[in-house]
């Protein structure tokens, strides 16, 4: 199993010296209102329940464990109570979604709609009559299709379009943008969205990337170099110089890590 690891909260240097709460933004790549909220005990409890229901147990060093450690520390210094729940988490919920892509199970954890953790598991593989394990590497097209499910509701912006273009170039081996292809569609979507104010009216990633494999004229297994190229493109075109959790770059990076494990 591979996992996008959250940052484990640091213990204060001395007992009672640091009374500042550990906030979501301190340990997860989140933004907006959620980033400034302290992690509360009941938030962690909800994530533990979700992991147990879907994965059979909470994951060692995983999202629920990190949330529990942060919540325990916040309770110890008196900034939250044992039964407290963060208002935005209580209103919008904690979710754990499963997506099956090319024999892999992608598990995405979110708080208030923002991704805080992602796991990739290999599902049981087929074996041939002579007992050889057959396990195919994840392709660029499949990684893009995974993005349509893990971040499908995200409006397409210039960083997404740049990442999709970099992925298409890696898949086809050509720098020529294919008319009507994924990169061209993503660029058009980003340009269109830039003229709109309401997210509800904007073109979303799932509208561009669903069925990505069939839309690519060529495809290949994701390598670390492919992922690095896509990550670089997304970073360069994001004003905050950050990749989107569960987005194109994140899915490519997860696919590359899994492919390296398969080939190890």
UniProtKB/Swiss-Prot annotation:
Keyword Repeat carried by entry: yes
Domain SMP: 22-76, 138-194, 203-261
InterPro entries: LEA_SMP, LEA_SMP_dom
Superkingdom of this protein's organism: Eukaryota
Region (Disordered): 1-23
UniProt keyword Repeat, yes or no: yes
Keywords noted in UniProt: Repeat
Biased composition (Low complexity): 1-16
Role played: LEA proteins are late embryonic proteins abundant in higher plant seed embryos. There are two subsets of LEA proteins (5a and 5b), the first ones are expressed when the cotyledon weight reach 80 mg and the second set are expressed above 100 mg. The function of those proteins is not known.
Homology family: Belongs to the LEA type SMP family.
Note: This is a SET 5b protein.
Protein's recorded name: Late embryogenesis abundant protein D-34
